[in-house]
Amino acid sequence: MHTLLAFIFAILILVSLHEFGHYIVARLCGVKVVRFSVGFGKPFFTRKRGDTEWCLAPIPLGGYVKMVDTREGEVSEADLPYAFDKQHPAKRIAIVAAGPLTNLALAVLLYGLSFSFGVTELRPYVGTVEPDTIAARAGFQSGDKIQSVNGTPVADWGSAQTEIVLNLEAGKVAVGVQTASGAQTVRTIDAAGTPEAGKIAKNQGYIGLMPFKITTVAGGVEKGSPAEKAGLKPGDRLTAADGKPIASWQEWANLTRQSPGKKITLTYERAGQTHTADIRPDTVEQPDHTLIGRVGLRPQPDRAWDAQIRRSYRPSVVRAFGMGWEKTVSHSWTTLKFFGKLISGNASVSHISGPLTIADIAGQSAELGLQSYLEFLALVSISLGVLNLLPVPVLDGGHLVFYTAEWIRGKPLGERVQNIGLRFGLALMMLMMAVAFFNDVTRLLG
């Protein structure tokens, strides 16, 4: 229910403001608006105010603004001056562009509001490399500072991860790093076409790198877990399992995952004294029906390293909204690059998410707090704005192309050309929606 409410609220905000952008500019341009609807289908709420019918409909996958238009039915003589299709192309361009531009402006405001509460930045340093992962096979080492991905400079951990994941299935990914010793080198990830890369793309997942260094000290023990039953407490240092030394937390985590229901004899230190305990990991079924072990221990991060890579501060309100602008421009450019890679075949369609995934992320971000949810809304608003500006007929961007061509030529494009374009655009969007739903379902099924 929490996830559903977070998703519905997000759709109401983002779609309402997108359509309100169209509505406001249409009214400013003297166009009569007949209906403003959030959602598709038969409205369950209708309120008439002035010339406009305001509606809420049950399918929360979009909305629309219906204007007087001679192409969509008979228009009275009195309403002809207020018909959308009778306006100068410049006015129609302004009306159509207003929706996606409102989404981009909203993203700036949402990011700015979030940043005004405080900002935490993670520098692009590798803290931990998990064994037997894409990153480990590429030769990444703890202490590497990621400087660029395929020649694109990266300034923080999030940007570095996004660039790597988006390029993963396009071919070799050249990651420029500065090693812990200060040497400049390139780590090459060659995972295109592998099942592992496909899984990472579909789940926007984990390539085996973490910014944090994790010690072999227990940072937390879950109540009722096998670890608590065995007597473990926060601060215990794990030293050996079944007589073999534990070199890293990843080693211990891999052992427990591979040992569901099997007894493990753990050696640990507490207050300078050595203790042993028998732990039998709980058996947990994953979405793909594989069974893993879980003991309920969380690691303690290396606090000195954490202080080195993490920077927390509270910018001024002016600076916060300036950062919101920068973040919106950056994410818009990343989204455009992704669509370009998608068209050229250099990005996987597995990255496309539908409403189920968006709803899941909405719920997760809302649980993390207001800032996380605001930034989720901003990111989806950017995606909505950029997507609608693409020059695809049926989208706002496609209509912008038609009206710009009309302005240049002095007359509209032929009806046949427009119809072919609209059919092509509709087919493309139906295909994209089908892929998005397919990806959603396969993600849910693991």
Curated annotation (Swiss-Prot):
CDD domains: cpPDZ1_EcRseP-like, cpPDZ_EcRseP-like, S2P-M50_PDZ_RseP-like. This is Putative zinc metalloprotease NMA0084. Pfam families: PDZ_6 (PF17820), Peptidase_M50 (PF02163). It comes from Neisseria meningitidis serogroup A / serotype 4A (strain DSM 15465 / Z2491). Zn(2+) binds at residues 18, 22. Belongs to the peptidase M50B family. Its main location: membrane. The lineage of its organism: Bacteria, Pseudomonadati, Pseudomonadota, Betaproteobacteria, Neisseriales. The chain crosses the membrane at residues 93-115, 376-398, 419-438. The active site is at residue 19.
